[in-house]
C-alpha cells in the first residue's frame, strides 16, 4: 500500500512493505525514502536517514541543504518540479527600472519557539550573510544587495545594484530568528548546535557524532508534515550505509554508484530514485602561478580537447552522471551555442603545431 507524502517541496513514496534505498553520485543523486521496512524496528511514524556528520547548522553560514530545508524556511521555495513557488512570502514584485524586490510575508508566521517571524528577521538574515566577519559560504549570491528596508512587519524591500535573474531563487535561504542571534557572533553562537527555524521540522535532540532528531512543527505555514519524526543517523561510510539499509536500521540513504548493482539484486525490497544535482568535479589550472598560461592563454581550452569526459562517467560513475563543460549545470538558461571544447585529440595536435611548431 503506497501513498505520496509531500514534504517541504519534495514528493516521496511511503510504503508499509518495502524499503527504499538511495544512491548518491557526483552529478546524479539516486534518492530514496521509506517509512519502515518489513524487517525494520523503526516506528512507522519515524524516518531514519543515513547521514554525514554535522558540526554546525546555520543556513546563513553553511550549505547543508538536506537538514537546512527541514529546519528552516525561506521566502521562496522550489516545488517537486523545481519550479519557484511562494513560501514564507505569499507574493512578491520586481521593479526592473530600480532593480528592487518587494516581498510580502504571510500572516501568522512563527518560529519553532513560538515567536513571530517578521520582515526584520529577513533583513537580519541577509545582513548576517553579507557581514564579512561571518565568512558565509554563500555570500557571493547576495553581493548585489545595496539596501534592505522594512516598511512594516510583513514587507521587506531589497534594492540591488544591478539586475540579478537568480535573486528570487536565492531567497529560498532559511530565515534566522533575530531575537536569538542579535549581538552574538554568528560563527560561534550556541544557536548553531541548537538551531531554531520556521521549517516543517524542529530539532529536539543532537547526540554528537551519533544522531540528530527532528520532530514535526505543528505551526508550519504549509501545514503539518505527514512524517512525525526524522532521525539523521550519522553513518559516514557508504558501505556501512548500504549494510544498514539492508538490515533495516536505515530507511533512506545516499550511496555510491558501484553499490547500485547489489541493490538491484534486491529490487523487491528497495525502491531506487535518481535526482540531478548541481555538484561537479573539475581540474583547476594555476593561471596565476604559471608563466605557461600567461604566454599561451588559450592552452587551457586546448587541454580540454584531451579529456574524455564520457569515458570518465562510464568508468568512474558507472554511467550515473552527465558531462559538465562549466561550473554551471545545464538548466533553463543553457545555451547550445557555447563552445564546449569536447574530447577531440586531433584538435590538440593541430593546436600543438600552431603554438609550439611541433
Positions of predicted regions on the chain:
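A structural "hinge/loop" feature
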Residues: 50-68, 88, 115, 167-176, ...
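Periplasmic-binding protein-like
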Residues: 293-332, 352
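Gly/Pro-rich hinge or "lid" segments in bacterial periplasmic/extracellular proteins
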Residues: 79, 83, 172-225, 229
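N-terminal lobe/hinge region of extracytoplasmic solute-binding protein
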Residues: 50-96, 127, 196
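Structural transition elements
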Residues: 20, 323-358
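Ligand-site clamp/hinge motif
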Residues: 218-263
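Aromatic- and charge-enriched surface segment that lines or borders ligand/interaction sites
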Residues: 90-135, 157, 293, 300
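Surface-exposed binding/hinge segments that line
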Residues: 93, 97, 139-181
